[in-house]
């Protein structure tokens, strides 16, 4: 287990190993399972992600129990078929996958936490877009997920991937960074470039607060995953182009941790501040749960 991204990169270079193979090796040692068994387990995760994207993008999609999120993928699909999307057709594919996954999550469907349920659309959005546009094989997609896991584990051990601890930067920000690093690795970038991709992705979302309306993983969480997927692909392209983060990746992770812990509790998943604390956010909360007095009476 590595204490930093720097150690991870150095190990990959010194041992001429891919990040995916490093993660597989560590999982084999930890679980006692064979390489085939470990990869088969990751394939199950990939299958869950694919099923969620398919469910969320089929027909009119899905709707959350509250009715406040859902069906937006269908709107985006129809728009993309009849308009020249400003962000490009391919980017819309990533956005659709991200939104679809989080709409399925909000509708109580089955998703794969990457690294959390609240950020579960960011990695699939980027990954399935790359599968479509760059003909990724299933083995490459599994490698993508192992690479994401390796980078994500370092973030989790040195900072946090929980919105309640570090804000949305720790959830969607971490997921976006994991996807960016993995994309660079899968497309032949150097280990150093993967580190820069992660640093750039986190830097771009540094300070993002966690302010779920009514405390539910719907508003603004679903759409933030769309931004996370787009940010991952942009950060990967920057790194593959040779652009570097001036702040080393481990220092960026440390900064994210400090920023997150300095956020007031109202901006760390409590549903009290930010968008959740707006008049409309409060009204939505009352409509779903009633007033505080109602809640006391019901208990």
Predicted regions and their residues:
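Alpha-helical support elements that line or immediately flank enzyme active sites
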Residues: 124-135, 180-188
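Acidic-glycine-rich active-site phosphate/pyrophosphate-binding loop
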Residues: 88-105, 140-159, 204-212, 247-250, ...
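Conserved active-site and cofactor/substrate-binding residues in soluble primary-metabolism enzymes
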Residues: 33-48, 89-96, 106, 121, ...
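Generic N-terminal targeting/processing segments that precede catalytic cores or assembly contacts
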Residues: 1-109, 133, 242, 249-299
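A structural signal for small-residue-enriched, beta-sheet-centric alpha/beta enzyme cores
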Residues: 163-176, 180-186, 191-299
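Glycine- and small hydrophobic-enriched segments that form the cores of compact globular domains
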Residues: 86, 113-120, 132, 136-137, ...
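Short acidic, glycine/Ser/Thr-rich loop/turn "cap" segments at secondary-structure junctions
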Residues: 106-114, 127-130, 160-165
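Conserved phosphate/anionic-ligand binding catalytic regions in large, soluble enzymes, centered on
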Residues: 108-126, 170-175
């Amino acid at each position: 287990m590595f204490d930093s991204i720097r150690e991870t990169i150095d190990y990959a270079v010194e041992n001429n190993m891919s990040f995916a193979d490093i993660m597989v090796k560590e999982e084999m040692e930890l679980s006692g399972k064979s390489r085939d068994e470990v990869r088969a387990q990751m394939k199950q995760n990939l299958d869950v992600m694919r099923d969620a994207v398919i469910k969320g993008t089929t027909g009119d999609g899905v709707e959350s129990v509250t009715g406040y999120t859902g069906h937006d993928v269908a709107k985006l699909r129809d728009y993309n078929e009849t308009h020249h999307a400003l962000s490009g057709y391919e980017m819309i594919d990533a956005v659709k996958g991200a939104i679809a996954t989080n709409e399925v999550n909000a509708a109580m469907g089955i998703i794969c936490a990457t690294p959390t349920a609240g950020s579960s659309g960011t990695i699939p959005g980027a990954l399935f877009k790359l599968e479509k546009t760059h003909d990724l094989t299933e083995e490459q997609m599994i490698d993508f997920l192992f690479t994401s896991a390796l980078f994500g584990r370092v973030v989790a051990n040195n900072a946090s991937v929980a919105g309640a601890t570090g804000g949305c930067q720790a959830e969607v920000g971490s997921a976006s960074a994991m996807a960016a690093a993995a994309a660079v690795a899968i497309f032949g970038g150097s280990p150093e470039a993967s580190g820069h991709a992660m640093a750039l992705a986190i830097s771009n979302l540094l300070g993002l607060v966690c302010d779920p309306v009514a405390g539910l993983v719907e508003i603004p969480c679903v759409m933030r995953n769309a931004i996370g997927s787009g940010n991952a692909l942009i950060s990967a392209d920057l790194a593959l182009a040779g652009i570097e983060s001036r702040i080393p990746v481990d220092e960026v992770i440390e900064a994210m941790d400090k920023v997150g812990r300095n956020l007031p509790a109202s901006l760390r998943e409590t549903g009290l501040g930010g968008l959740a604390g707006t008049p409309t956010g409060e009204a939505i909360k009352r409509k779903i749960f009633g007033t505080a007095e109602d809640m006391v009476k019901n208990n």
